[in-house]
Amino acid sequence: MEKLASAAALIGKRRPERPVRGLRPHAAGRAARWFLEKFPGDVAYAYKANNSAFLIGALYGAGIRHFDVASLPEIEDAVTIPDAHLHFMHPVKSRHAIRRAYELGVRSFALDGEDELDKIIEETGGARDLLLWVRIAVPSINSRIPLERKFGVSGQKAANLLIKTRQAASELGLTFHVGSQTTTPDAFVTALADLHKLIVKAGVMIDRLDVGGGFPSRYPDSDPAPMDDFMETILAGIETLPVKENIRLMCEPGRALVAEAESLIVRVDARRGHDL
């Protein structure tokens, strides 16, 4: 594979007629190492962000061993990664996908309703080795793609679901997602405050907490707050929760790990003024 110092160097040397992928494995590795150093828990790469072998290899080389998978094809791909811990975090899954995932060794499943919980119990044969995550609906504040109306449960339904899931789970987790490309940490403040109320209402012991994804990357039209601000806000919010001191944490960065690691160089044949 040819190595060049920059996109400009490539254009000057090759004058490509067709689109060219620019790969920067060091960028993915740098981002992964930052999360592994700053976040005191499991860093699960959101597989759907980009599952190219190049990027997965760069993340694995930096130390990533947990993966947030959202479909059976993703699981069948990721299960080949040595020492991988897979978390099936899509809260709506087919019976076949649940059953096959369990056969492939997946023990971590997300849900946001009693119907989904019943499916998981039935398709795993009432297994007692499950890590079950209840996904809570939280507000999406300053996010490019809000998810609050798509997935999650709230209020008394959430409390009831937590109680029922506690009975079926070897480990019980809480998870949420503040929305994709969230540019300020405000959403995490609100989400963790909502979780505080829910834990008190349900009165159950939580074994794990997943703060989800939404961690941003920089684009020409998006200048998010520094990543350190997100981490400080999240960890401060966790400190206020009525959970055990040694609760195991997880986060699910996607674009924040890989957005700067790959680009596509294309030729523009014409433009009108400064418009593209």
Could you say what each language-model-derived stretch is?
Residues 1-130, 166-169:
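A charged N-terminal "starter" segment
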Residues 25, 29, 95, 114, ...:
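Non-membrane alpha-helical structural segments and their capping/turn regions in soluble enzymes
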Residues 26, 48-52, 70-73, 91-93, ...:
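Active-site beta-loop-alpha junctions enriched in small/polar residues
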Residues 42-44, 66, 85-87, 108, ...:
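Structural preference for beta-strand elements that scaffold enzyme active sites
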Residues 56, 79-80, 98-103, 120-123, ...:
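Short acidic, glycine/serine/threonine-rich loops at helix termini
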Residues 104-111, 144-155, 178-186:
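Flexible, glycine/proline-enriched loop segments at strand-loop-helix junctions
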Residues 112-171:
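Conserved anion-binding
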Residues 180, 184-276:
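C-terminal active-site-proximal or functional interface alpha/beta core segments in diverse enzymes
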